[in-house]
Amino acid sequence: MIDKAYEELIKMKEKIMRDSYTIHKELSESVESILNELWINYSPESVEHSKKLLAIDGGMWVKETRQGVIFIVNAKAIVFEGINEINSEGKVLVHIFSPGNYAKERIELLMQLLELQLALKLVENVDYVLLDGSFSKKLGRHKSELKVDLLDDIVSIDKILSLEEKDEDNMLRFLIAENQLVLSELVSRYKDKLLFISKNSKSSDLFKQAYSDITILELFTQNCGYSKILEKKIDENYILSRKASKLLSGLNYYFTNLRLEPSERLFRLDFFNADKIFEYLKVLKPVSLKGYPYPLIKVHKDVRVGKEDRERIYSILEMKRKDISWWPSQFY
């Protein structure tokens, strides 16, 4: 950054502070009358220590080269009893796409599919499944009037059938449908066990403000509790798989924002049984670490691709590294 930018920042500092205070005050005035209706202070008197929780997350490494897009996706599922690990299982896919369209979208869908396959494989032996990300993100936001039928008779927990498709556009559609097929199987058979957890939700359904609901609640509440439970209907226009559409269309799911520890951050929880909200709080509170479920923190740490991982990948693939440390990566 050039020196002039710092000079301007020093000049503007007081104005920024004044404007920040004004914005905070105006926001407070606009929500204070409804805050008590939309936020419920609650901390369970008793908690459930003995429930088996399955925490699932995925990670990826992607490198675009002139020849194609090389990537590694991995997903892991850990079974916890309280905060104690009982066992775990992982899935990995190493692949290369030729240069073309939708590479990033397809890779993200592949990672998610590994997560959902693990969930479907292990769900029967646990009480609850903790999935990273909202239900709507898992379902996908790809509107289409054309349904995909080719995969409807096959729900695999081991293979990824969409990779057999060579056309990039078709592969993307098939991956969306394959994700939705596995997700619909999970929901239709085990929906009361599924908890979708988002730490960075941008939803504004509650307060209808320009700021996210979580931002407002973190600014103006400190106690443990949850926000008013809202209901959403699954829109079949977002479901490409015809079989998944039959299983999911018109089904309702619910969401709220939780705080498990005083003054800590909130997260959004999506679920299918509104009557079990107190049960969910009893289960999640004893595994909370600074307000977030520890099982998801642990599994995220295991699948995240860190600096040492990247260096090792480059070494194995014998890929050229930068000779000049400050040289922008896009130029080598």
UniProtKB/Swiss-Prot annotation:
InterPro entries: DSB_repair_nuclease_NurA, NurA_domain. Induction: Part of the nurA-rad50-mre11-herA operon, these genes are cotranscribed. Keywords: DNA damage, DNA repair, DNA-binding, Endonuclease, Exonuclease, Hydrolase, Manganese, Metal-binding, Nuclease. It is an enzyme of class 3 (hydrolase). Its EC number is 3.1.-.-. It comes from the Archaea. Mn(2+) binds at residues 57, 132. Pfam families: NurA. Its cofactor is Mn(2+). GO terms for molecular function: endonuclease activity; exonuclease activity; metal ion binding. One of its GO terms (biological process) is DNA repair. Involved in DNA double-strand break (DSB) repair. Probably acts with HerA to stimulate resection of the 5' strand and produce the long 3' single-strand that is required for RadA loading. Exhibits both single-stranded endonuclease activity and 5'-3' exonuclease activity on single-stranded and double-stranded DNA. Belongs to the NurA family. This is DNA double-strand break repair nuclease NurA. It comes from Sulfolobus acidocaldarius (strain ATCC 33909 / DSM 639 / JCM 8929 / NBRC 15157 / NCIMB 11770).
